[in-house]
Structure formats: structure tokens, C-alpha cells
Amino acid sequence: HLSYGNGSLHVDAAFQQTLWSVAPISSGSEVAQGYLIGGDVLRLLHGHMDECLTVPSGEHGEEQRRTVHYEGGAVSIHARSLWRLETLRVAWSGSHIRWGQPFRLRHITTGKYLSLLDDKSLLLTDKEKADVKSTAFCFRSSKEKLDIGTRKEVDGMGAPEIKYGDSICFIQHVDTGLWLTYQSADAKSVRMGSVQRKAIMHHEGHMDDGLTLSRSQNEESRTARVIRSTVFLFNRFIRGLDALSKKVKSSTVDLPIESVSLSLQDLIGYFHPPDEHLEHEDKQNRLRALKNRQNLFQEEGMINLVLECIDRLNVYSSAAHFADVAGKEAGEAWKSILNSLYELLAALIRGNRKNCAQFSGSLDWLISRLERLEASSGMLF
């Protein structure tokens, strides 16, 4: 991503691969405000905004997080309820989305695509396995009156048709014609006050399957993308450390030392509190934005992920010990990575009561690590 520093623009390469895309945009037409366009990050709201389409929280395993359901409550402000709409057969980047136009839905924090599998189950699929046939959906304004005729392509960015917060959208799978709906809750779930309903595809569905769309704020969608790249990198790092502990030869272990080091520095800066000399209103706005970032990261399980990284590195008593197992380069970076992990942990909970409360149960565990390792002394407190 891009950031400003010392009056110039910098590319921070640690968050994600440094790939750039060139997108054609029609300069002869305008994009209507408040209408859906390709590439938007949004939430799919059901039932007068009481529920939204989402996946299980970060505390669940990877396989369970492939399932999709409708959930009410605070999830409507969590990153795991964000989706990116990617149009198929793009003429102009960011053009208006029409009724019946094929698109794919990519879940922001996992990077996986909503897919209808051969057995008619609805799951998130890895990018590499997400073929167009299984992942192509479209919006319909009604289940009865389908626009099945061939529509003439409109020059430029197209006509605005689907309005945020206003248009009622039914989601149809392009290849099978099935509709996105929900599995009716059983009596036991109703009695227990369950707030989740499994999302499924059906040839009829329910009368109230219509969804309204809510566009994500730029800061929110940016943070969600940072979460995705960070989770991917840290999990890769943990898998590498686990492989080392099983005494696999270091030459066969994928241990992204440099990427983790750079990412940690970027993240520490990302959560740095605003300068004290700022005007009061500007400072308060930045503090609110910082707290929102902290909350989004915590809700996706990032505090626990940082603790897992610390726990794996604490298996080694010194840089020399780590170097014996992982190699000279890794040994030289052991101390700085461990210190940066403690610093990031502090940045994630600093000034945030909710995150401090969530972390409090791990405090004794952390202090025992701090006391044992001189490399990390003083970094948290």
C-alpha cells in the first residue's frame, strides 16, 4: 500500500505483494453517487438491516470459516462481513452494475470466493480453485420477472440501476438459476435465541430473500485488506516455525523472516497514536480511526495470532539457539522480531478498554515470557 512520509509518497511492500494493475476508465461519463459499481466493498444486509451475510469469527478453524451464514448483532461492523464485488467481462473499471450482470463475491478478510459446489453446497473457495461456473452470481430485482433478453451494452460507465440502501436485491447463481436464501431455524435454535441462519442455494427460497446493500468506508475496507495479508503472512510464519520444531531440515522450511520483519514495522506504524501537537478535533478523529482499526483486528483474532507467534519464538532461549535451528539470517532477526511482536501487541491494546479486557486473561502468561527473555524486556511496559 501507499503511505506519506517526509513530504513524499512511499510504497510499503510488506502488507502485500507489490503487484500493480492498470484499469481502463471511461473519461467521457460520470459515476453516479450512491449507486453500485464494480469493485465496491460492501455488506449484504437482510431483514431490515438486522442481519448480514458473513462467515464464522476468527476464533474458528479455517475449514469452518468456509461456511456462510446470516448473523445479526455487532457483526454488521466487523471486517468479516465485508465482500468485494468483482464483475466478469469488464469493459470499464468501476462501471455501474446492472440487474442480471454476472459478478463474483470475494470475502475480504479470507480472500476466498463465494461458490456453489457440485453437491449444491454453498462455501468459500480458494482463489486458485474458484472457477467462473461455480462463482458467478447476479442481482435480480425480482424472482418472478427475470430480464432474460440480451441487453445492449451502454457506452462509458453504464447507467446507474442498483442503489445503496434502497434497491432490494435477490442473488441468483448464474449457471444453475438457484437463489441465495437461508435454512429455516429449528425449534431448538429458536428457543436458544440463535442469531445465525445458514446460507444456502434453493430453486425457490423464501419470500424475504431480498437484500439491501451497504457500502464500506474506505478506511474500513483498507484495514480489512491489511488484516487478510497479515493473517496469511503470520500463519505462514507459524507453519514454518512448527516445521522447525519437528526437526525438519531448515532448507525445506518456508520461513518468511524478512517479510515478517517488514510487516511488523508497517503494522506498528499503522497503529501509532496521533501526535500530541495536533488540533483537538483532528486528534480526536485520528484516535477514533485508530480505535476502529484496533477493534477490527481484534475481532479477526489478530491478538491471539500475535500471541501464537510469540509463543513459537519463545521455544528458543536465545538468538544463537534459534540460529542453530533456522539458520544465521533467522538467528540475527530473532531478537528484533520478538521485540516487534511485543510492540505490536502493545499497539493493538493501547487505549482500548475492550481489547485490554480481551487480552487480560493472557497477562500472566506474557509476564512469564518477559521475565525469562532479556530480548523482550521493557518492550511492553
Can you annotate each of these PLM segments?
Residues 1-239, 335:
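Lectin-like carbohydrate-binding module/patch detector with strong preference for beta-trefoil
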Residues 3, 51, 111-115, 121-125, ...:
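Elongated alpha-helical scaffolds that mediate protein-protein interactions in large eukaryotic proteins
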